[in-house]
A protein has these predicted regions:
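PAS-family sensory/regulatory domains
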Residues: 61-75
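PAS/PAS-like sensory domains across diverse signaling proteins
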Residues: 40-43, 51
Length: 134
């Protein structure tokens, strides 16, 4: 009997769950809002980040397709994209001033520390949010 081939979508979902489990102590114990990003549709966050942006749960936050358009104010998109690509290509962490958009309106100004994190052959970006002010 052959084993069912896993789709790329299933594989990426499994990776996000795996990294979340590996980082669970930090994600659930930290006072900071934190999110993990593989790509626009494969991401996770802790309850503090979900609440910061007005979501009832991390699952509700992660279910929204995309990333920059629904969550990041237009003025911060280039900054966050540059920080992300520097992390992915140069393996460098960074600190940036980012304005997030809240569900249902409003904004949150914050400082984001973005760190590249390898997991099972894939490179994620892990974002620690500080100094968040609505």
């Amino acid at each position: 009997m052959s084993k069912k081939m896993q789709t790329q979508e299933e594989h990426h979902e499994e990776l996000v769950k795996g990294l979340y489990e590996q980082m669970k102590t930090v994600l659930e114990g930290s006072e900071q809002p934190i999110f993990i990003y593989l790509d626009d549709n494969h991401k996770a966050c802790n309850s503090k980040f979900a609440a910061l942006l007005g979501f009832k749960s991390p699952e509700e936050w992660a279910s929204i397709e995309g990333f920059l358009e629904p969550y990041v104010a237009e003025k911060s998109r280039d900054t966050l994209m540059k920080a992300y690509w520097d992390a992915m290509k140069k393996m460098v962490a960074s600190t940036s001033q980012i304005t997030f958009m809240k569900k249902g309106g409003g904004i949150v100004n914050s400082t984001v520390v973005l760190v590249p994190v390898p997991f099972q052959g894939h490179l994620f970006s892990v974002h620690f949010v500080t100094n968040a002010v609505s």
